[in-house]
A protein has these predicted regions:
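A helix-boundary/hinge signal
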Residues: 1-436
Length: 436
């Protein structure tokens, strides 16, 4: 038993009657920290420790970047989900978990120093079709998960906690408001002033000057049935409307005269699912609405190539591989020229497309497939540009095979380059085509 603002003698009587133990706040219930005050930092640190314990330790450096990305995406990120659903966690908690996730992804350790991240973390946490690795943004995921409480409050008003203030982020409440529309039946479970029930719009948007004259308490409590009964909505208006408000009032009056309540329950629809039912997954995606897409995502992630090869090409597209041009910008040791041709400056675009030995390599692997016409030329703008133009020239049933071949080819070129730079291996790149 956990007494809340209860006299000690009363608590003792109840304890003796129920024959149960007594504890106090803060405590843990069903794995969650709960308190009658704001949670302390120490109450949440245990969750960060749980995440750190899950790191595979000495095995991590032996894993590829793609392997670590899978662990971050499906294991480490999943640990705080239960907490994010129930509690609006502070930003320091998100930053602490992200520090662990980021460090493990790039270096396989719990902590790293600056300069180890090849791609900005905000970009990594985007969905794969928007240019990221599909690792969830914890803050946005928390908003999406907590939106389920707003949905349950709307669709299941008989729950014991219904009517209580739900501590959700303003972004969560704002998205929920514009994403749910209602088909009115008896009007018992639809808010008159704020819900989108009138031809898919809310009165807040249809008549903003009238809405300003409604007290906040009535905005959150007045149902459609109550408002239409004896024109109660008219008496909700406080103060002078002004001439714009008067025009909106008359238009609203005309629209409401056509509303007839039915003897059925109100039906609420979530617009981001075909079924009309809410899901946290669709809510998470909705927070990225309007974002710029990542054009080659299907070519890359839907191919048959191994994950480590696809992750490398993802870095290539973002120009985040440690070639000579990037090493030079940071004042690090670097080869003066391309390790393959020894004529031009090494960039990732030159290495994969315009280098004379690279072009010969692509010709060799494409010729047996009668696709030698697609081999890159010395005038190619970039690796991605050549890939995209070549992909479009193929019939649809050949595109997936071609994408896989390009990704594997790029991986072999990079491995050959590293063997030459770090191991002094001087074998010809053309001979590596047999590895495919």
């Amino acid at each position: 038993m956990i007494p809340i603002h209860c006299d000690g003698e009363v608590a003792e009587v109840v304890n003796n009657t129920l024959q149960c133990s007594t504890t106090s706040f803060p405590t843990t219930y069903l794995g969650l920290p709960i308190s009658d005050r704001k949670l302390r930092r120490s109450d949440l640190l245990i969750w960060i420790e749980k995440i750190a314990i899950k790191l595979p330790g000495w095995k991590a450096p032996l894993m590829s970047l793609a392997g670590r990305a899978v662990l971050v995406r499906y294991v480490i990120t999943a640990i705080p989900i239960y907490l994010l659903i129930a509690i609006r966690v502070p930003k320091w908690f998100i930053r602490a978990v992200d520090k662990i996730r980021k460090s493990f992804l790039w270096k396989g350790r719990k902590e790293i120093n600056g300069g180890s991240c090849l791609v900005a973390w905000e970009k990594v946490m985007r969905p794969i079709d928007l240019g990221g690795l599909g690792i969830h943004n914890l803050e946005i995921m928390g908003w999406a998960l907590q939106m389920c409480w707003l949905w349950f409050e709307k669709t299941k008003p008989d729950r014991p906690w219904a009517g209580l203030e739900i501590p959700v982020h303003p972004n969560t409440a704002a998205l929920f408001t514009v994403s749910v529309f209602t088909t009115v039946g008896n009007g018992h479970n639809t808010l008159f002033w704020t819900d989108r029930w009138l031809h898919g719009c809310s009165i807040e948007n249809l008549a903003p000057n009238v809405f300003k004259c409604i007290p906040a308490r009535l905005r959150k409590s007045r149902t459609v049935r109550e408002a239409l009964l004896d024109l109660t909505w008219v008496s909700d208006i406080r103060g002078a409307l002004g001439w714009l408000g008067l025009v909106e009032y008359l238009e609203l009056w005309d629209v409401l005269t056509d509303v007839v309540l039915q003897d059925t329950e109100d039906i609420h629809h979530w617009k981001f699912e075909a079924s009309g039912l809410f899901s946290s997954r669709s809510a998470y995606r909705a927070f990225f609405a309007g974002s710029v897409g990542f054009e080659p995502w299907k070519q890359l992630w839907k191919s048959w190539a191994p994950s480590k090869c696809k992750t490398f090409v993802w870095l290539t597209i973002r120009n985040r591989c440690w070639t000579a041009d990037r090493l030079q910008k940071r004042g690090l040791p670097h080869p003066d020229c391309c390790p393959l041709c020894d004529h031009e400056e090494e960039t990732i675009q030159h290495l994969l497309t315009t280098c004379v030995f690279t072009r010969q390599f692509w010709f060799n692997i494409l010729q047996p497939l009668n696709l030698s016409r697609l081999a890159p030329r010395h005038t190619a703008n970039s690796f991605v540009d050549w890939w995209r133009k070549s992909w479009k020239k193929l019939q649809k049933h050949l595109r997936k095979e071609f994408n896989s071949l390009v990704i594997l080819g790029a991986w072999i070129i990079w491995k050959h380059r590293n063997a030459r730079v770090f191991d002094g291996n001087n074998t010809k790149l053309a001979g590596s085509s047999s590895n495919l």
